[in-house]
C-alpha cells in the first residue's frame, strides 16, 4: 500500500500508514464539560427557578415569581483566583417579582444569590485556588423496564419496574401460582387488579374489557381479589387496601387513600420522570415501537375508510412506513376509558389499541395498548402509562415485546456537570422555598420586599458542598496534558444516586456491545473500580437526554454507496441497523469493493451482503478513548497490557526537553491542543515580539494581542507546568495555531517521554523481573530529567496568648541557619535548602499572663524571665530540599483575603531537579513497565557496529507471556524512521502492516528482521546472537523513588496505643507485623524480638529509660509493660470483665498509667522542697539559685 505524508502543523509532517479516509474531524475533546455547563447557564437555571416559583404563602395572599437572572463580572481573574486560593466565581443576581394579590401591588427587586463558580475555557473549575473537575456520572435512566427470569420450577416469569428520577417505584410480577401482583415502593404485594380498580374501574368485567379476557395471570388475580366488604364499592375498597399497604396501622378513609395515591404518582412535585423518563416511557409503550414483526388481527383503515394494511399482514419495515403516519394522528384507534368518579383521577383515560395475534398461540387475538399521545412536558406518570405498561407485561407472556438489558447503553445515561449542578441547586432552592413560605406568613404583607423573604444561605451552602466534597467533584489530575484531558472525559458509575463498589457485580463492570463507539472498552483502572470508571470514546457525544451517541456514515439504500452524510445514533437506535466496519474497502465513488462486508448488527458480528448495510463506521479509532488511541499497534497488544499502557501514559512526568514519539498515531496534536495547556492564537496575524514570558501578535485589524506564558507554575500533582514559545518574530500565524508548547509537548504535539535506542537483551541479570538497565548518558545529558515544585505554607495567627510573629529573631538558632533569611525572616528566592532548613522564621508566644505561684518561684530560682516564645518556624520536610523558586506573601495591609485570625501568610515554592535514578518507574505505551535497576557507564553498555551505545536494555522475557507485540513493531518501525529522519503516524486498527514495516526497514538500509550484531562494551566482543534493537517511545512515570524512600529514627507516636505512626506522610516507622514476628521466633532471636516489641514500639517508660541510659552510658534496663497491653486491659474492663495481671509469683502487677513525666518533679513539689531545704538551691555565689544536677530523689518528692 502507498503511504502518504500528512502535515500535522507548520512544524511537523508525518508519514501516514492509514488507509481509511478521514471523513469526520474529532470533535472538541472537552465538549462533554463545556457544552453541559453552557446548557446549565443558558437554560438550566431558568428551568429550575420556574419549577420552584411562583412561591405562594399558605393563605394565597402573596406570590413570589422569578423574572430573570444575570451573572456579574468575577471578582478575581482566573490567575488571581489561583494565587489568592479563592473560587473563580461570579456573583449571581436574580430578579424577583412579589405580588400582593389583595392590593394588587407588585414589587420587583434584584436579589444577590451568592457567588457561582465559573467553568474555565477548558472544562475545569477553580475552587479554593485548586483546579477541580466534575466527573460525569453514568446512571440507570428513568423509565419502564421489563425483565425475564426463571423460577425454581423452570417456568419463565416476567417482571416490570417503573423507575422515576424521584418518587415511588412501581413493580409488577407474577408469583409462584401465576397471579399478577403489584408493589408500590417496595411494600408488600397486592393483586394487580387492586391498582386498576383504584383508577375507577371497579368491576371484573370492566377490567377484562380493557385488557382482554384470556389473560391467565390477570384472571387469577381477579379470582384472588375478592370483594371483602359489600357495604363499600370495589373502587373504595381497592383504594383503602393500597392505603393500608403504604401506611400500615393508620386510620383510613376513601378520601385520604385517594389523595395519598394521587400524591404518590400523579403530583409533579413528588413524582418526576424528567424529560428523559418521559421520552423512554413513550418510546417503550408507543405502538410505533411495538408493532414491527407482529401479525395484524384487524384491518388498518385510514381516515377515509380505505384499507391501508389488511388483516393477517406481518408488519415489516415497508408496511410500518404506511402505518406510522396514521399512528401519529390524534384520534387513530383511540379508546377513551371512562373511570368511576370515585377513582384517583376522574378524567377519561386515552389509550391507543390495535388487535394482533399472539406469538405463542397464533390463533389467539390479543390487544396492543399504547399510552396514546402524551406530551413530553408531562414529567409525572399517568394512568394511561400504567395501563399500557401492564398491557406490555401481559403481552410478554404471549411472546410479544422484548425484555430490557439494564447494562445496555440505551438504558444508562450520563449526568454531566450541568445536570449535577442543577440537581444540587434545586435542593438548595427547595430548602429556601420553605423559609420563604414561613417568612411570608410572619412578615407584614404591605411592607415586605423580595429581599426580606429570601435567605440564600441554603443555596450557597449546597453549591459549596457540591464543589468541595461531592464524590464527583475531584481534584484535577495534573500530571501531564493527557491526564488532564482524560479526567474531564471520565465517566463514573459511582457517586450519589449511582452504584457502590461493593454492590456492583460483574455484569455492570463488563464490556457491553453497546459500548462500541461510546465508551472505551480498554481504559479503566485496575483494582476495585475496574469497569465502574470508564472513559468516553473519541467520537462519542452526549445528547439532550444524556444518552451517548456515536457518528456513522449513512449508506444510500438505493445505490448502496457510502455517503458523507453523518448520523449520530444512540445505542438503542443502532440496534435496528447493520453497520459496516470503517476499514471496509471502498471504491472512489463510495461503493463497496467487495460484494460482502464484515458488519455488526446488535451483538452479532456478521459477514453480510452490501445490500443489507445501513451505515458504516466513521473511523477505526471510533471504538477507543484518547489515551488508548495514542498507543500505536494497539491491535497487536493483549487488552490487559493495553489497559496498563493507556493508564500509564496519564502518569508520565513532563520532562525538561521532551520529544514527541517518532512512531505516533496522529492523535498527539489534538490531545495536546484540546488539553488547554498550549498557548493558541486567537486570531490571524504576525508575531512581533517573543521572549520566555510573552508573545505579542499584531492582528490583521492592527491591534497588538499579548499572550502571557505560564512559567514554572506548580500543577496539582506538584509537576512543573511551563510554556515555551515555538514561533519566531515575523512569522505569519493562523487562528488556532499553537504559539507556545505547554508541559510534555513538542511542536504542538503530545510528548510524554523520549525516543531512546532500546535493545531486548539480558545484561548480567540486572533486568530480571522487569528491571531496566540504563545508560549513564541518559542521566548526564538530562534526557529523563524533570522539575518538581512543592508548596509550603506558614500562617501567623492570633493566639489566646498574643499574636504569632514572622521574624528573623528565633530563640536558640545559630546564625548559620539564618544566613538565607531576609530581614523579616523569610527565605530569599534562589537559595538552596536541605531537609530541616528554616523557610519562614516564626515565633509563638508561650504566654505573658499573670504569673502563678509556681512560675513566680521558678523565676525566683532562675533569676530571669523564662523566654516566653517558642520556635514554630516552617522548615523543609524530609526529602523536600531544592531551590527556592518563588515566595508569595499575603497580608491584610495589601488587601489580601485571609482566613479569620490570620494576620500574615507566606507561601514558599521549592523546585527540585530530579534526574532519573535507580528505583524510578519507567514504561512504554504498551503496558511494558519496569523499574530502573542499574545505571551503567556509557563505555560498558553494549554497542552497535557503528559504535553507538544502546540507551536502554529491556528483558526479552517481558514480551512472550504478556503478549504485547505492539512494542516490537514500534521498535522496528521506529528504528527505520530514525534512520530515514522522518516521523510516522500509524493510527489504531489502521496502521502499518508487517510488510510495510519490512519495506521501511529495507528503505532505511537495515536488515528486514530488525536485528543487529551487538558488541559487549566491557570486552569488545560480539554477542553470539543478533539482537532486536530499535527506537521506542519510553516515559518516566510519576512513581519516583524520591517520593517513596523513607527512614525514621525518632518520630511521632500514636496517642492511644503509643506505637509509632505509619507511613511517610506521618514520618512513621516500619510495621513489624505478625508474620515478621514468626520469622524471628523461628530463629529463636528472643532479645531482638523483645526490644522490637517493647523499647522500639510502645513501652513508654522503657523507651525513655533506654534513652537515658544510652546518654549516661549505663546498662540498658529491663523492659516494662507495652502500652497496647494496658489498652487491652482497659478495653476488657470497659466490657465489665475484671482483669488482673499477675507476675510469676502470683502477685498483681499494678497497671497504673505510666507517663513519660512520672519521674519529673512537679512545680508544686519544688515549691514545697524550696521551703523545707533552701540550701539545696544555693549556688556558688549565694544569689544565683540553681536546680540540682541530679534529679530530686523520689523520697524528697
UniProtKB/Swiss-Prot annotation:
Residue segments, region Disordered: 581-603, 1172-1197
Keywords: DNA-directed RNA polymerase, Nucleotidyltransferase, Transcription, Transferase
Swiss-Prot/TrEMBL catalytic activity: RNA(n) + a ribonucleoside 5'-triphosphate = RNA(n+1) + diphosphate
Biased composition (Polar residues): 581-597
InterPro entries attached to this UniProt entry: DNA-dir_RNA_pol_bsu_ext_1_sf (IPR042107), DNA-dir_RNA_pol_bsu_external_1 (IPR019462), DNA-dir_RNA_pol_su2 (IPR015712), DNA-dir_RNAP_su2_dom (IPR007120), DNA-dir_RNAP_su2_hyb_sf (IPR037033), RNA_pol_bsu_bac (IPR010243), RNA_pol_bsu_CS (IPR007121), RNA_pol_bsu_protrusion (IPR007644)
Keyword tRNA processing attached: no
The family this protein is said to belong to: Belongs to the RNA polymerase beta chain family.
Protein name listed in UniProt: DNA-directed RNA polymerase subunit beta
Domain of life: Bacteria
MF annotations from Gene Ontology: DNA binding; DNA-directed RNA polymerase activity; ribonucleoside binding
Gene: rpoB
Lineage, highest ranks first: Bacteria, Bacillati, Bacillota, Bacilli, Lactobacillales
Enzyme type, top EC level: transferase
Organism: Oenococcus oeni (strain ATCC BAA-331 / PSU-1)
EC number in record: 2.7.7.6
Amino acid at each position: 500500500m502507498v503511504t502518504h505524508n500528512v502535515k500535522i502543523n507548520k512544524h511537523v509532517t508525518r508519514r501516514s500508514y492509514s488507509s481509511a479516509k478521514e471523513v469526520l474531524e474529532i470533535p472538541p475533546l472537552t465538549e462533554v464539560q463545556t457544552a453541559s455547563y453552557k446548557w446549565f447557564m443558558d437554560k438550566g437555571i431558568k428551568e429550575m427557578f420556574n419549577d420552584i416559583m411562583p412561591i405562594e404563602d399558605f393563605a394565597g395572599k402573596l406570590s413570589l415569581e422569578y423574572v430573570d437572572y444575570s451573572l456579574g463580572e468575577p471578582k478575581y481573574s482566573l490567575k488571581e483566583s489561583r494565587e489568592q486560593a479563592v473560587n473563580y466565581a461570579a456573583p449571581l443576581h436574580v430578579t424577583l417579582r412579589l405580588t400582593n394579590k389583595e392590593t394588587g401591588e407588585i414589587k420587583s427587586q434584584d436579589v444577590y444569590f451568592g457567588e457561582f463558580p465559573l467553568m474555565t475555557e477548558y472544562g475545569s473549575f477553580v475552587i479554593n485556588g485548586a483546579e477541580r473537575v466534575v466527573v460525569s456520572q453514568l446512571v440507570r435512566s428513568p423509565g419502564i423496564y421489563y425483565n425475564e427470569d426463571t423460577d425454581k420450577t423452570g417456568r419463565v416469569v416476567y417482571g416490570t419496574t417503573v423507575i422515576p428520577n424521584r418518587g415511588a417505584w412501581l413493580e409488577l410480577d407474577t408469583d409462584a401460582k401465576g397471579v399478577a401482583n403489584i408493589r408500590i415502593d417496595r411494600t408488600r404485594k397486592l393483586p394487580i387488579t387492586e391498582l386498576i380498580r383504584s383508577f375507577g374501574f371497579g368491576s371484573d368485567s370492566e377490567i377484562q374489557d380493557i385488557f382482554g379476557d384470556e389473560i391467565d395471570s390477570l384472571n387469577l388475580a381477579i379470582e384472588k381479589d375478592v370483594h371483602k366488604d359489600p357495604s363499600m364499592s370495589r373502587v373504595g375498597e381497592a383504594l383503602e387496601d393500597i392505603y393500608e399497604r403504604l401506611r400500615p396501622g393508620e386510620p383510613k378513609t376513601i378520601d385520604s387513600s385517594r389523595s395519598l395515591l394521587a400524591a404518590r404518582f400523579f403530583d409533579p412535585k413528588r413524582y418526576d420522570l424528567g424529560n428523559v423518563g418521559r421520552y423512554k416511557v413513550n418510546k417503550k409503550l408507543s405502538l410505533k415501537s411495538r408493532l414491527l414483526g407482529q401479525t395484524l388481527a384487524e384491518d388498518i383503515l385510514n381516515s377515509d375508510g380505505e384499507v391501508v394494511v389488511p388483516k393477517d399482514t406481518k408488519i415489516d419495515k415497508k408496511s410500518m412506513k404506511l402505518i406510522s403516519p396514521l399512528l401519529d394522528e390524534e384520534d387513530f384507534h383511540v379508546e377513551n376509558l371512562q373511570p368511576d368518579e370515585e377513582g384517583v383521577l376522574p378524567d377519561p383515560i386515552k389509550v391507543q389499541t390495535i388487535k394482533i395475534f399472539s406469538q405463542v398461540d397464533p390463533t389467539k387475538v390479543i390487544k396492543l395498548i399504547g399510552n396514546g399521545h402524551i406530551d413530553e412536558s408531562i414529567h409525572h406518570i399517568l394512568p394511561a402509562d400504567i395501563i399500557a405498561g401492564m398491557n406490555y407485561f401481559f403481552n410478554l407472556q404471549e411472546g410479544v415485546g422484548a425484555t430490557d438489558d439494564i447494562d445496555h447503553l440505551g438504558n444508562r445515561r450520563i449526568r454531566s456537570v450541568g445536570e449535577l449542578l442543577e440537581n444540587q441547586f434545586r435542593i438548595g432552592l427547595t430548602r429556601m422555598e420553605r423559609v420563604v413560605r414561613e417568612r411570608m406568613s410572619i412578615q407584614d404583607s404591605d411592607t415586605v420586599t423580595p429581599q426580606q423573604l429570601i435567605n440564600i444561605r441554603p443555596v450557597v451552602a449546597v453549591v459549596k458542598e457540591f464543589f468541595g466534597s461531592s464524590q464527583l467533584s475531584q481534584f484535577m489530575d495534573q500530571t501531564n496534558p493527557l491526564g488532564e484531558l482524560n479526567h474531564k472525559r471520565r465517566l463514573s458509575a459511582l457517586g450519589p444516586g449511582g452504584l457502590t463498589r461493593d454492590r456492583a457485580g460483574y455484569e455492570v463492570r463488563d464490556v457491553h456491545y453497546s459500548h462500541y463507539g461510546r465508551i472505551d472498552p480498554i481504559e479503566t483502572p485496575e483494582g476495585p473500580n475496574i469497569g465502574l470508571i470508564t472513559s468516553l470514546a473519541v467520537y462519542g457525544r452526549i445528547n439532550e437526554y444524556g444518552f451517548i451517541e456515536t457518528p456513522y456514515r449513512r449508506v444510500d439504500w438505493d445505490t448502496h454507496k457510502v455517503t458523507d452524510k453523518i448520523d449520530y445514533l444512540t445505542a438503542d437506535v443502532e440496534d435496528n441497523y447493520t453497520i459496516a466496519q470503517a476499514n471496509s474497502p471502498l471504491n472512489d465513488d463510495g461503493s463497496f469493493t467487495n460484494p460482502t462486508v464484515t458488519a455488526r448488527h446488535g451483538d452479532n458480528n456478521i459477514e453480510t451482503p452490501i445490500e443489507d448495510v445501513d451505515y458504516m463506521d466513521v473511523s477505526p479509532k471510533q471504538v477507543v478513548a484518547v489515551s488508548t488511541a495514542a498507543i500505536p499497534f494497539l491491535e497487536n497488544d493483549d487488552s490487559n497490557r493495553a489497559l496498563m499502557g493507556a493508564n500509564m501514559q496519564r502518569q508520565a512526568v513532563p520532562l525538561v526537553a521532551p520529544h514527541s514519539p517518532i512512531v505516533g498515531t496522529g492523535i498527539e496534536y489534538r490531545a495536546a491542543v484540546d488539553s488547554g495547556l498550549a498557548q493558541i492564537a486567537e486570531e490571524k496575524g504576525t508575531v512581533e515580539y517573543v521572549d520566555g514570558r510573552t508573545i505579542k501578535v499584531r492582528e490583521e485589524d492592527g491591534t497588538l494581542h499579548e499572550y502571557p506564558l505560564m512559567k514554572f507554575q506548580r500543577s496539582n500533582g506538584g509537576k512543573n507546568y511551563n510554556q515555551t514559545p515555538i514561533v519566531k518574530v515575523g512569522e505569519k500565524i493562523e487562528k488556532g495555531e499553537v504559539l507556545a508548547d505547554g508541559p510534555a509537548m513538542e511542536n504542538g504535539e503530545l510528548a510524554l517521554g523520549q525516543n531512546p535506542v532500546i535493545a531486548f537483551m539480558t545484561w548480567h541479570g540486572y533486568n530480571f523481573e522487569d528491571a531496566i538497565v540504563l545508560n549513564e548518558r541518559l542521566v548526564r545529558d538530562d534526557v529523563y530529567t524533570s522539575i518538581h515544585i512543592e508548596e509550603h505554607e506558614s500562617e501567623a495567627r492570633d493566639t489566646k496568648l498574643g499574636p504569632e510573629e514572622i521574624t528573623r529573631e528565633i530563640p536558640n538558632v545559630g546564625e548559620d541557619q539564618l544566613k538565607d533569611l531576609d530581614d523579616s525572616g523569610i527565605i530569599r528566592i534562589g537559595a538552596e535548602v536541605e531537609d530541616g532548613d528554616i523557610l519562614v522564621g516564626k515565633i509563638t508566644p508561650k504566654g505573658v499572663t499573670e504569673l502563678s505561684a509556681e512560675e513566680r518561684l521558678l523565676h525566683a530560682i532562675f533569676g530571669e524571665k523564662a523566654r516566653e516564645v517558642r520556635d514554630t518556624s516552617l522548615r523543609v520536610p524530609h526529602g523536600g530540599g531544592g531551590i527556592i523558586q518563588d515566595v508569595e506573601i499575603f497580608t491584610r495591609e495589601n488587601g489580601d483575603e485571609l482566613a479569620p485570625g490570620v494576620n500574615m501568610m507566606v507561601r514558599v515554592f521549592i523546585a527540585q531537579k530530579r534526574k532519573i535514578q535507580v528505583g524510578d518507574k519507567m514504561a512504554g505505551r504498551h503496558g511494558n513497565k519496569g523499574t530502573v535497576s542499574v545505571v551503567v557507564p556509557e563505555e560498558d553498555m553494549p554497542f552497535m557496529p557503528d559504535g553507538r551505545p544502546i540507551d536502554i536494555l529491556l528483558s526479552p522475557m517481558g514480551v512472550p507471556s504478556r503478549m504485547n507485540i505492539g512494542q516490537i513493531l514500534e521498535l522496528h518501525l521506529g528504528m527505520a524512521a530514525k534512520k530515514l529522519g522522518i516521523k510516522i503516524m500509524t493510527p489504531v486498527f489502521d496502521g502499518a502492516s508487517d510488510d510495510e514495516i519490512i519495506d521501511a526497514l529495507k528503505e532505511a538500509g537495515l536488515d528486514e528482521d530488525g536485528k543487529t550484531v551487538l558488541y559487549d562494551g566491557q570486552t569488545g566482543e560480539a554477542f553470539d546472537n543478533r539482537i532486536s534493537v530499535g527506537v521506542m517511545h519510553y516515559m518516566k512515570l510519576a512513581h519516583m523513588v524520591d517520593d517513596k524512600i523513607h527512614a525514621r529514627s525518632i518520630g511521632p507516636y500514636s496517642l492511644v496505643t503509643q506505637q509509632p505512626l505509619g507511613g511517610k506522610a506521618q514520618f512513621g516507622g516500619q510495621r513489624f507485623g505478625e508474620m515478621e514476628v514468626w520469622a524471628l521466633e523461628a530463629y529463636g532471636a528472643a532479645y531482638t524480638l523483645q526490644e522490637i516489641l517493647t523499647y522500639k514500639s510502645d513501652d513508654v517508660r522503657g523507651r525513655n529509660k533506654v534513652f537515658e541510659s544510652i546518654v549516661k552510658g549505663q546498662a540498658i534496663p529491663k523492659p516494662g509493660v507495652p502500652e497496647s497491653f494496658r489498652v487491652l486491659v482497659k478495653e476488657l474492663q470497659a466490657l465489665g470483665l475484671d482483669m488482673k495481671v499477675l507476675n510469676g509469683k502470683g502477685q498483681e502487677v499494678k497497671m497504673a498509667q505510666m507517663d513519660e513525666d512520672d519521674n519529673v518533679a512537679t512545680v508544686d513539689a519544688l515549691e514545697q522542697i524550696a521551703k523545707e531545704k533552701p540550701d539545696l538551691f544555693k549556688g556558688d555565689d549565694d544569689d544565683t539559685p540553681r536546680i540540682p544536677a541530679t534529679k530530686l530523689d523520689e523520697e524528697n518528692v
